[in-house]
């Protein structure tokens, strides 16, 4: 059976991921690409347990990009998503405003995911914390910059699990699942 390649029908353009510890970023990239994210952006936040130097992150980029390429091929995607260089929190706040909608997964509250307005969104930026979540001041700053805080219910999900649930919800709500 011949499969056609899937283009960029997914509307989650960017996934801003606070830097997790160890090799979790590799799994995060792989699964996000399989689900249709176009770009993964590591971000250094206050509660990141892992605090790599920019040069260390730059050195890992080719390997992370290979993981993205492999996941794209496995998923039959027509494009290879980008793994961007690590950004500071301030850089991520400024950059995420380019999306039609920015969604902050926040364990500290917000609207239920099914209440978030996704109508007429051609691009969504998904913002995800590390193992320690977001500092309340960072969450406030993200919201002041236009992010809508959403929560996934009463369970506290791991930093590598919560975004997969969120991406799946967005895919379903936008007709891509």
Regions found by a protein language model. Give the residues of each.
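Single conserved hydrophobic/aromatic residue that forms the stacking wall/gate
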Residues: 1-7, 12
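Structured adenosyl-cofactor binding patch, chiefly the S-adenosyl-L-methionine
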Residues: 136-177
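S-adenosyl-L-methionine/SAH cofactor-binding core of RNA-modifying enzymes
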Residues: 50-126
């Amino acid at each position: 059976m011949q499969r056609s390649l899937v283009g960029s029908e997914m509307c989650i353009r960017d996934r801003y991921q606070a830097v997790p510890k160890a090799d979790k970023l590799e799994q995060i990239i792989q699964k996000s690409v399989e689900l249709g994210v176009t770009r993964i952006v590591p971000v250094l936040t206050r509660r990141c347990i892992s605090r790599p130097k920019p040069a260390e992150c730059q050195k890992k980029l080719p390997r992370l990009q290979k993981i993205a390429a492999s996941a794209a091929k496995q998923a039959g995607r027509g494009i290879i998503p980008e793994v961007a260089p690590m950004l500071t929190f301030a850089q991520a706040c400024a950059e995420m405003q380019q999306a039609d909608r920015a969604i902050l997964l926040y364990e500290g509250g917000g609207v239920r995911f099914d209440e978030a307005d996704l109508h007429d969104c051609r691009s969504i930026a998904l913002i995800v914390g590390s193992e320690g979540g977001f500092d309340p001041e960072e969450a406030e700053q993200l919201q002041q910059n236009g992010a809508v805080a959403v929560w996934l219910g009463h369970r506290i999900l791991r930093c590598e699990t919560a975004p997969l649930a969120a991406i799946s919800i967005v895919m379903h709500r936008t007709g891509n699942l």
